[in-house]
Regions:
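Conserved glycine-rich cofactor-binding loop
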Residues: 13, 20-21
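A glycine/serine/threonine-rich, flexible loop-to-helix segment
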Residues: 162, 186, 198-220
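Active-site loop-to-helix junction immediately N-terminal to the catalytic Tyr of the SDR YXXXK motif
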Residues: 108, 158-167, 179, 207
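Residue(s) in the substrate-gating loop at a strand-loop-helix junction
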Residues: 152
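Alpha-helical segment proximal to the catalytic Tyr-Lys
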Residues: 133, 182-183
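Substrate-binding pocket helix/loop in short-chain dehydrogenase/reductase
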Residues: 104-105, 109-117, 204, 212-216
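Active-site helix of classical SDR
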Residues: 128, 169, 177
């Protein structure tokens, strides 16, 4: 079954934060393969630019890199302003950029708490706030604009690792999604979240080459 047999996203515009690797890259590739222009962000400019060119060439579709640090309000405003200067409206906002921090309870640092909460929760809220007008521009009752927040299974269950701020942040993402969904549905903007489980990615760090058999047993 092809996506275009279910719905058509040809010539639409998407914003994917953290779009240069992991789940963000997969989402970006899916949009590009189906004719959507995509803006992607990441902190590391060279890798972001290289990935955008790679994806653009592969799918023969525009993938525009905007390097920025979305953990700060300055970074959020620079990112949103740049897209506002290029587009009258957007159809999709994928709040994917995130961070994790692992440390024993007894020594868990304020920096490890704030870094994760700022990027995983604060930036998600303010990006949605600042992109609202662009989402409204393209939204209609027949074809709503959409916000997709990337949560985590660790926001629903008790995490197996000592990633206290990460699990807490993702629980906040899931509840904030409900709150935003109830507010924005009245304006033809649909807000949803997904809750991925563990998979090999740069965020897992040393766990990328981990034996996933035990984790798989706990996955229903």
């Amino acid at each position: 079954m092809k996506i275009d047999s279910l719905f058509n996203i040809q010539d639409k515009v998407a914003v994917v934060t953290g779009g240069s690797r992991g789940i963000g890259e997969m989402i970006t590739a899916g949009f590009l393969a189906n004719g959507t222009k995509v803006y992607i962000s990441a902190r590391k400019a060279p890798a972001l630019v290289d990935k955008a060119k790679e994806l653009s060439d592969k799918y023969n579709q525009e993938c525009i890199p905007i390097p920025c640090d979305l953990s700060s309000m300055n970074g959020i405003e620079e990112f949103t302003n740049e897209i506002q200067n290029k587009e009258k409206g957007i159809d999709f906002l994928i709040n994917n950029a995130g961070a994790a921090w692992g440390e024993p309870l007894e020594s868990f640092s304020e920096g490890g708490w704030d870094k994760v909460m700022d990027l995983n929760v604060k930036s998600l809220f303010f990006l949605t706030q600042k992109f609202k007008n662009l989402l409204l521009h393209n939204a209609s009752e027949e074809d709503p604009s959409r916000v997709i927040n990337i949560g985590s299974i660790d926001g629903l269950n008790v995490p197996s690792m000592e990633t206290y701020s990460y699990g807490t942040s993702k629980a906040a993402v899931h509840h904030l999604t409900r709150v935003l969904a109830a507010k924005l549905v009245k304006e033809n903007i649909l807000v949803n979240a997904i809750a991925p489980g563990p998979y090999p990615s740069a965020m897992l760090g040393s766990a990328v080459n981990h034996d996933y058999s035990e984790i798989a047993k706990r996955n229903p």
